[in-house]
Amino acid sequence: MFCWLSRLCGELSTPTRRTTQLIWSSAARSMVLSSQRIPELSSFVARTNTCGELRSSHLGQEVTLCGWIQFRRQNIFLVLRDFHGLVQVVIPQDESAASVKKILCEAPMESVVQVSGTVISRPPGQKNPKMPTGEIEIKVKTAKLLNSCKKLPFEIKDFMKKTETLRLQYRYLDLRSVQMQYNLRLRSQMVMKMREYLCNLHGFVDVETPTLFKRTPGGAKEFVIPSREPGKFYSLPQSPQQFKQLLMVGGLDRYFQVARCYRDEGSRPDRQPEFTQIDIEMSFVDQTGVQSLIEGLLQYSWPSDKDPLVVPFPSMPFAEALASYGTDKPDTRFGMKIVDISDMFRNTEVGFLQDALSKPQGTVKAICIRKGAKYLKRKDIESIRKFAADHFNEEVLPIFLKTNENWNSPVAKFIMEEQGLGLVKLLETQEEDVVLLTAGEHKKACSLMGKLRLECADLLEARGVVLRDPALFSFLWVVDFPLFLPKEENPQELESAHHPFTAPHPSDIHLLYTEPHKVRSQHYDLVLNGNEIGGGSIRIHNSELQHCVLDTVLKEDVKLLSHLLQALDYGAPPHGGIALGLDRLMCLVTGAPSIRDVIAFPKSFRGHDLMSNAPDSIPPEELKPYHIQVSWPMDAETEKSSSNHPCRSES
């Protein structure tokens, strides 16, 4: 391809040549999955072959291809594209083929055509080893315009920048890009391998659970669906949690589902109102069994073009994750761990450190940024300090190490020589390192330092320091979570850390009735590169224990879950499971910047479908059967005026 371009158009500018090369390199990337494809790609359709499958072994064969016109040069060559790749087509120049030439030369880019012709070898010196079909081209005999393309809102090329709004508005065009094709086809293949692993190798049953359900207490907000019964509503389930537990009561033993789930969480850029999870439940299983299953599942379905996964994945208690990384989903690809240096400052004269250590759970935390003085500017440090003040109402002190004995910091004069040497040893500091130090209540201080750890990693990587290898997939199990957490609005009351069906740790059941805030759960999260991609637990299978958790601890209305409590009374087996977030997993596997890039038709970050303009209004006559009347919000002044109107009637 590059050779004939050079032969035909040596006058091309450098940017144009680079653009052409990018087209082909993108196409080559789409071939990564070719070896995994089943044959018979052209069965039942009008073509004999796909554009990307032809090789020198097909020389002399008569073929029929269907695809989109991606590139044309001087009305002599064009590039035809389909889902499988690209192929070069030679446009006939003789008079007898004038009609064929007219079709192929006049059809706009991205028009759909069908061509028939002979597979021939490219002339010597014009073969392209970087392209799977680079040894051959198609000498066209007949052509048919299947559909012409109007002027496009954007070019169908991955390297052409498009706003996300435009991409979502014309999603059907965006799906033609090499990257979107790769993402969705890889997603399909991984799901297929997961089904094979679960059903064929381990006897799981694929069961579809209802989408229309009833509102359940706790957890995320649910979408409400009206019914034709006055005042009664369905809700869309945020997960099949209750149904899969009921399937265990029903003796299904091993269940899985590629489940659609729904959460009404408003405008969140990293979430979708509807999403997909690989939902799994097993009877007679413990935590180790579920974790081993998932490790095998991911290992079996992992893309062949990536390094194989090493199992078992490491495990880390929640308390350690918080203390060392400041989060329950640590990115373990790089260090910069949080270190507790409270003992170094028990007798300090620094005011805010003294205040923090005098309070319950008061602590002093630090992180060491290797060569931070070399890469971070003063404005970066000030930005970090401002972030801490604005979001955590905490102070952060920087310490610059010119040498191990020379500290440049506002607190340097308060650090005795013995303390300084102790800090150097504890933090393993070196010349040009920067230490960030804060103090406060343990959880809050850890959370702040966890945020600053990631912020500093972003700053260092922006300066060219590689900390988080994008090709490295660092899986981690986080375990031993608390079963309950204080409510934000009322810390005296408790809520489930995950959901109310999670079983307490066997060693802590006795605390459930006296000190429930100390009870650990049998919950486990699967973390990948600092992102939670799965969560599960061993469930409560005893009706009395479940009733106690709901009624006594959480103060929930048990009537809403009477069906589940009743089912647990009829010989429910011990059971547990997990759900893997398929969208998030695929986002990380493909390296996509957003989960919207691995979903065929996603919503915007505000939850809108920009292609169809959903959600949309419904005429009042269509709402009437559902006994719904829309009341439009009014500003305070309008509402006051309306309430004082003399004609307003009370009802």
UniProtKB/Swiss-Prot annotation:
It is found in: Mitochondrion matrix; Mitochondrion membrane. The keyword Nucleotide-binding applies. It comes from the Eukaryota. Residues 241-244 are annotated as: Aspartate. One of its GO terms (cellular component) is mitochondrion. The modification N6-acetyllysine is found at K379. The modification Phosphoserine is found at S239. Its EC number is 6.1.1.12. One of its GO terms (molecular function) is ATP binding. Transmembrane segments: none annotated. L-aspartate binds at R263, R539. Belongs to the class-II aminoacyl-tRNA synthetase family. Type 1 subfamily. This is Aspartate--tRNA ligase, mitochondrial.
